[in-house]
Amino acid sequence: MELLVLNTDFESIAVIDTYESMIWTDRYNSYGDFEIFFAMDTQLLQYLKEDYYLWLKDSEHCMIIEDIKINADTEEGNHLIVTGRSLESILERRIIWGQRIFNGNLQNGIQTMLNECIISPSIADRKISNFVFVPSTDPKITRLKIDNQYTGDCLYDVIKGLCEENNIGFKIVLTDENEFAFSLYAGVDRSYEQTENPYVVFSPNFENIINSNYYSSRASFRNVTLVAGEGEGAARRTAIVGSASGLDRRELFTDARDISSDTEDGTLSDAEYMAQLRTKGLKNLADHIVTTAFEGEVEVTRLFKYGEDFFIGDIVQIANEYGNEGSAYISELVISNSEEGLSIYPTFKTISK
């Protein structure tokens, strides 16, 4: 499996096809990462440098080299370990500058964030000249709404959180014109819960799951939150989000004192402010749902092929030998290549509704 090395001018300077192991991870709504393990060769250091890029044919994501480590070991031999993250990590380099309220269409809101922080910011030094926004026409994206207030939040954390809340993905791909093209996208439903697309099923019955791990937990589940906003003591403004009673009620406190009714555009009405508190509460509850995950090494050369029959973010049908079955989306995919061969490990997550 070959890797292409690009310098900071996006010029191809080397092809890597000799290494002891490589782990390359793509993710649906967060940045991916990689690790490559080499037998030490000083020539590698000529083109494996921090801030250079790695491109893999089997992935649409491009990685940034961030860490280079040399291990000297008289018994095991000397090794070079190169690690880094995908282009999505660029968003960590910016914050929401000052106080901002985003209300209305979600995609438009994210585009505004990117315009103000990266594409056409008022502070020229914040601009990344080759960064562009590619709007989606998918109704799964265009119908989504936002009603949030931010002050100094990390841009990456904001976009990641919004995508996770709405079960959508985001990506930054390197185009043929050497642009960093940002876009939102939604996976295709290929489960038994729809009839428009061919089914993709991973199950022992189809002999396409080599091994699997199933995990389910309600330990951190919460369904009611008291959201406390601005003010002090008994005068602090609060909202209750969620409902349940008795033993089924699981409460959570949400500190929302960072949400202010006084904004750069004027004072929020009571209704507008309470809507902001409720949004904050819903986000906190979304971080405390029942956790269900299914990890497995799958056979991807015969029945269903990654990159042809299914992609990151797609909703597929999964089952294991113990009767755990349902639909879930592919949240990440690990490509592992070593002397033992090529393996692909997807992680499936249930959809929060």
Predicted segments — roles?
Residues 26-42, 78-90, 227, 288-302, ...:
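Oligomerization/assembly interface segments of phage tail-like spikes and tubes
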Residues 69-91, 130-221:
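Short beta-strand-centered interaction patches in the first periplasmic/extracellular domains
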Residues 27, 35-36, 84, 99-132, ...:
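Amphipathic, non-transmembrane alpha-helical segments in extracytoplasmic/periplasmic proteins
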Residues 43-135:
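Surface-exposed cap/loop segments at beta↔alpha junctions
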Residues 54-85, 171, 315-347:
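Short beta-strand and beta-hairpin "edge-sheet" elements
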Residues 12-53:
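N-terminal "assembly arms/tails" that initiate or stabilize quaternary assembly
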Residues 160, 190-290, 294, 301-340:
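Acidic, small/polar-enriched beta strand-loop surface segments
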Residues 1-29, 203-215:
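Solvent-exposed edge beta-strands and adjacent loop segments
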